[in-house]
C-alpha cells in the first residue's frame, strides 16, 4: 500500500512567529497581500498584531473582512473580486477555520478561473493550478486549517455544506503564533480544543491511518489532555496556549492525509 503525506512548504511555530512574515514574503518574492480576516478579529486587535508587522516592513496590503462563520459561496466570490481589485499577489489569512476556508476558496478560484461558480469545487475538483500563495496565521487552536488540504463552503442557494478536498489549496506557509490566540474567549477555547481532540481521535482510528499518522495523532491527544484545561482556565498562560497551538497543528497534519470519521461527515 502506498501512503501519501502532504504538508505546507514551510511552517513557523512559536510565540512571536508572526514577525517572520516579512522574511516569508520577501523569500517568495511577493509584493502585495489581500488580508482575509473577520470584523471580530479587527475589533479586538488580533488582526492588528499581524498588520502591524506588515506596516513596520512597509508591505502593501488591502483587507477583506466580510468573512462570516461558516463562509458562503458569496463570501468567496466577493473575496475573489476584492483580490483582483487590490492587485495583490498573495493572501494572508488571519483567523480560525472560516478565514482559512474562505482564503482557500479565493486562492483556488483566482488560480483556476474555470471554477468561478465556486459550487463546482465541491468534492475532489480537478483543479490544474496551485492556489495563489496563502500565508495562514491561525487564531484558534482547533481546525488546523492552516495545514489541511480541505475546506468547507456553504452553498446558500441549495442550502448545503460543500466539502472541498484539493492538494492545490494547502497554504504555502503556516505561521502558528500562540500569541494570536490569547484573546480567544474561554468558551471558544474549549470548543475549538475539543474539535482538535476529535480530529486527533478520528485520525487515529480511521481506516486510512498508518504508522506515521499514528505518531502525530497520539502525540496530539496527549498534548490536548495536558494543555486544554490550562488554556481554558488561564488564557494568558503561554504553556497552555503553546501546547494547544502545536497539538491542533500536528493533529491536522495527520488527519488531512488519512481522513476522519463520521463525526466530521
Residue spans of the language-model regions?
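Glycine-rich phosphate/diphosphate-binding loops that line cofactor/substrate pockets in enzymes
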Residues: 19-34, 52-57, 85
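Short glycine-rich or small-residue beta-strand-to-loop segments that form or flank ligand, phosphate
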Residues: 33-38, 62-65, 91-94, 135, ...
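Carboxylate- and glycine-rich phosphate/diphosphate-binding segment that chelates Mg2+/Mn2+
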Residues: 150-258
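Glycine/threonine-rich beta-strand-loop-alpha-helix active-site module
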Residues: 74-176
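N-terminal amphipathic/basic leader segments beginning at the initiator methionine
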Residues: 1-28
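N-terminal small/polar loop signature for handling phosphorylated ligands or for N-terminal nucleophile
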Residues: 42-115, 229-241
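C-terminal catalytic subdomain
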Residues: 258-265
Amino acid at each position: 500500500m502506498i501512503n501519501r503525506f502532504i504538508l505546507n512548504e514551510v511552517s513557523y511555530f512559536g510565540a512571536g512567529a508572526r514577525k517572520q512574515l516579512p522574511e516569508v514574503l520577501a523569500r517568495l518574492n511577493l509584493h502585495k497581500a489581500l488580508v482575509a480576516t473577520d470584523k471580530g478579529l479587527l475589533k479586538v486587535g488580533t488582526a492588528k498584531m499581524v498588520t502591524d508587522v506588515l506596516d513596520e516592513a512597509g508591505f502593501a496590503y488591502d483587507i477583506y473582512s466580510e468573512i462570516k462563520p461558516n463562509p458562503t459561496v458569496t463570501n468567496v466570490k466577493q473575496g475573489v473580486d476584492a483580490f483582483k481589485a487590490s492587485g495583490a499577489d498573495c493572501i494572508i489569512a488571519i483567523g480560525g477555520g472560516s478565514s482559512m476556508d474562505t482564503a482557500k476558496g479565493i486562492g483556488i478560484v483566482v488560480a483556476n478561473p474555470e471554477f468561478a461558480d465556486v459550487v463546482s469545487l465541491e468534492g475532489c475538483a480537478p483543479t490544474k493550478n496551485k492556489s495563489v500563495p496563502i500565508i495562514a496565521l491561525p487564531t484558534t487552536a482547533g481546525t488546523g486549517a492552516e495545514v489541511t488540504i480541505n475546506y468547507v463552503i456553504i452553498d446558500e442557494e441549495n442550502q448545503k455544506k460543500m466539502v472541498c478536498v484539493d492538494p492545490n489549496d494547502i497554504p504555502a506557509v503556516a505561521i502558528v503564533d500562540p500569541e494570536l490566540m490569547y484573546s480567544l474567549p474561554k468558551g471558544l477555547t474549549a470548543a475549538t480544543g475539543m474539535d482538535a481532540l476529535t480530529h486527533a481521535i478520528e485520525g487515529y482510528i480511521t481506516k486510512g491511518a498508518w504508522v506515521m499518522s499514528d505518531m502525530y495523532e497520539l502525540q496530539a491527544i496527549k498534548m490536548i489532555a495536558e494543555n486544554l484545561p490550562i488554556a481554558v482556565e488561564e488564557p494568558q498562560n503561554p504553556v497552555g496556549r503553546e501546547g494547544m497551538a502545536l497539538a491542533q497543528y500536528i493533529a491536522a497534519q495527520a488527519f488531512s492525509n488519512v481522513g476522519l470519521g463520521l463525526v466530521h461527515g
